[in-house]
């Protein structure tokens, strides 16, 4: 009996020492993982900056693509990105917010709500090239829109719609139930509660999620490559039915060239794209802070 107790005590001591060893090593392993991730991103960014910094100029945004790297720019790709991303935002943001409000506040059929939530969550994980193939078959050929800006914008809108919907639904869930119940107790209708209680408090997170989804759309190349198929174009888009290209495709075009000067241009274009993404993220932070401050006051 005494030997059994001693053996259990010895096992307990060894297990306790092993747990303490793991506790002491865990911060080191976690810090190593963070360091490796940051170091990888920093090295890639340093390579891009050192390669393309001297190519940054207004000519990069104002000149058309050219076989001569000293005269080449990405004006058409830059304008094409603005057209497609702007139109997709006008489509997906209102629809995503409306869908989130319906799923969280207006839907009374639990089975339908769960079915929609499940499928929206699954759509958020679908590879972007699949959306491009669907857009090609339905919009480009099925509806006869061709390889136009509106086809690319709708494809990006459908791709980002699940992200906007999920983030907006999570924002609505953060609104305190006591505020909604208090408004209902005072005789407010569901529409009034949505307009004056839910939206003002959920809008900062909604806008943040929407801007982050749009930031993802800016850097997408696969669906636009399927829809547009153009890597070289020397004209400004003037309508939603014009042909187009975007910055990621222009970067891919330059990277695939054998000349070192074109690879330098691709690094400069990557820097422009990163600056746009950082600007969108900063805008999301500023808007969220201002709206939260306004709601608090």
Predicted regions and their residues:
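C-terminal transmembrane helix and the adjacent membrane-cytosol boundary/short C-terminal tail
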Residues: 7, 103, 169, 173, ...
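Periplasmic/extracellular loop-to-transmembrane helix junction in inner-membrane transport proteins
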Residues: 9-32, 46-88, 109, 250-264
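Transmembrane alpha-helix signature in integral membrane proteins
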Residues: 36, 72-102, 210
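Interhelical loop and adjacent transmembrane-helix boundary motif
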Residues: 65-68, 72, 224-274
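Transmembrane-helix boundary motif in ABC transporter permease subunits
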Residues: 88-120, 133, 141, 285-293
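Transmembrane alpha-helices
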Residues: 89, 167-168, 190-228
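Amphipathic cytosolic juxtamembrane alpha-helices at the membrane-cytosol interface
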Residues: 95, 108-112, 117, 180-208
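Generic hydrophobic transmembrane alpha-helix motif, especially the helices
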Residues: 121-158
């Amino acid at each position: 009996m005494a030997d059994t107790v001693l053996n259990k005590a010895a096992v307990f001591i060894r297990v306790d020492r092993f747990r303490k060893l793991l506790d002491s090593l865990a911060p080191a392993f976690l810090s190593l993982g963070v360091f490796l991730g940051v170091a990888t991103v920093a090295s890639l960014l340093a390579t891009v900056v050192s390669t393309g910094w001297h190519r940054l100029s207004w000519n990069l945004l104002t000149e058309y693509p050219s076989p001569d790297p000293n005269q080449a720019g990405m004006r058409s790709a830059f304008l094409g990105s603005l057209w497609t991303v702007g139109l997709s935002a006008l489509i997906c943001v209102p629809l995503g917010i409306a869908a989130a409000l319906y799923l969280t506040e207006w839907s009374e059929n639990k089975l339908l709500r769960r079915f929609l939530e499940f499928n929206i969550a699954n759509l958020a994980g679908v590879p972007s090239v699949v959306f491009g193939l669907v857009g090609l078959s339905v919009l480009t050929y099925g509806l006869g829109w061709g390889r136009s800006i509106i086809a690319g914008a709708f494809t990006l809108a459908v791709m980002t719609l699940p992200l906007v919907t999920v983030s907006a639904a999570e924002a609505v869930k953060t609104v305190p139930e006591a505020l909604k119940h208090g408004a209902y107790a005072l005789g407010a209708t569901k529409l009034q509660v949505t307009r004056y209680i839910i939206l003002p408090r959920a809008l900062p997170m909604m806008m943040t999620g929407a801007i982050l989804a749009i930031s993802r759309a800016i850097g997408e190349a696969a669906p636009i490559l399927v829809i547009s198929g153009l890597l070289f174009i020397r004209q400004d888009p003037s309508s939603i039915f014009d042909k187009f290209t975007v910055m990621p495709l222009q970067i891919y075009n330059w990277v695939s060239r054998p000349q070192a000067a074109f690879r330098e241009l691709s690094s400069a274009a990557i820097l422009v794209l990163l600056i746009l993404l950082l600007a969108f993220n900063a805008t999301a932070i500023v808007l969220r802070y201002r709206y939260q401050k306004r709601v608090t006051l």
